[in-house]
Curated annotation (Swiss-Prot):
Source species taxonomy: Eukaryota, Viridiplantae, Streptophyta, Embryophyta, Tracheophyta
Regions of compositional bias (Basic and acidic residues) in chain numbering: 375-396
PANTHER family on file: OXYSTEROL-BINDING PROTEIN-RELATED, OXYSTEROL-BINDING PROTEIN-RELATED PROTEIN 3B
Protein name, UniProt field: Oxysterol-binding protein-related protein 3B
Biased composition annotated in UniProt, kind: Polar residues: 443-458
Species assigned in the record: Arabidopsis thaliana
Tissue-specificity statement: Expressed in roots, leaves, stems and flowers.
Family the UniProt entry places it in: Belongs to the OSBP family.
Amino acid sequence: MAPNDPKKAVGGGGSGFFASLASSISNLGSAMTKSVNGLVPYEGLEVINPEGSTDDAEEEASRGRWKQEDRDGYWKMMQKYIGSDVTSMVTLPVIIFEPMTMLQKMAELMEYSHLLDMADKTEDPYLRMVYASSWAISVYYAFQRTWKPFNPILGETYEMANYNGVNFISEQVSHHPPMSAGHAENEHFTYDCTSKLKTKFLGNSIDVYPVGRTRVTLKRDGVVLDLVPPLTKVHNLIFGRTWVDSPGEMIMTNQTTGDKVVLYFQPCGWFGSGRYEVDGYVYNASEEPKILMTGKWNESMSYQPCDGEGEPLPGTELKEVWKLADVPKDDKYQYTHFAHKINSFDTAPKKLLPSDSRLRPDRYALEMGDMSKSGYEKSSMEERQRAEKRTREEKGQAFTPKWFDVTEEVTATPWGDLEVYQFNGKYSEHRAAADNSEDNTDPKSIQFNPWQFQDLST
């Protein structure tokens, strides 16, 4: 029987390539259900230590970025939201933010875009899936950051021009619910994404459901790849050291041929066992395994051809397909070098849109270490956004994105239905005209302006 379910392949007995990993699966629940006792005022809250140490519970719970008085006050405020989707209903303090927006974070997928180039170039249909799925995994090093990116203002954008041959544009297309759309392109592929995060607040943790649709089109053969990622769990939001895990399946399907990749992100077990590990297979349209894949989402991925039982083919060996690039040491926000480039004006195009995330005053103030100013600017923009909403309602007007159009397509995801936005091509026309312009305005001098109504009094 072919191991169509990678979880079965991992835990299915003493044989099989992934059998040696079964011990980490058998410990599932030890760390994920371990509750550190001793929090008398906060009964029922879990403080999960991924290292599984026997530290004193109260000492462990006191770790993290919060001061005790801030922690107590925030917990009192948040109790009423337990079980709720808090994506946009809660105003959060700047102390938990990183100097980046969700639109910029979408662009981090482009760091290892050369893997999509390789997927387009190869003639091997299964190796194509290895390259493409490794690209999808590569961003998880960035996703482990425990700082929250800023929610984009409605109409906000982020653009990155010709970085390693890739042009990228994203736009906040809806505020309630918060939705972003992104498009990237080079000579080998196009990337299109509609994202609507859904959350569930659980007290000291939060589940983040990636309600969205991600499609990659490889240009040489017109192959369309569809990606469904696993959910993400953020542990120890208020008490303890915050950490992130993404247990579950990632599925990438070749909608043209029916081939697919099923990769299992193992949950963090006792003393950190299993954390970061990813295992699975590339299957053909008949669900027969063709290539096994294994690695860690924060380090590297490798692959090896396999037989119909998922066993490595004789005479073959594991080959590394992706490896994490060097990262800065002791970076406050765990940024990669690429993340710093995303935040910089070095990757900004000529005639940068005034709605660009780089220009946000709250983001920039936080980057400069001025939390007081960042908090003030954040509150001011949120109030301006509320005022714009009231004005639209009074005028009977709906917000219309500039670079993406809403379609009639509603796609089903494991976590709910999603309205799909598509790139309308107008940005390509704008960018071509801007690049041919003689305007050499310093982008740093541009004032942030995503607003629909320019003379609005808040």
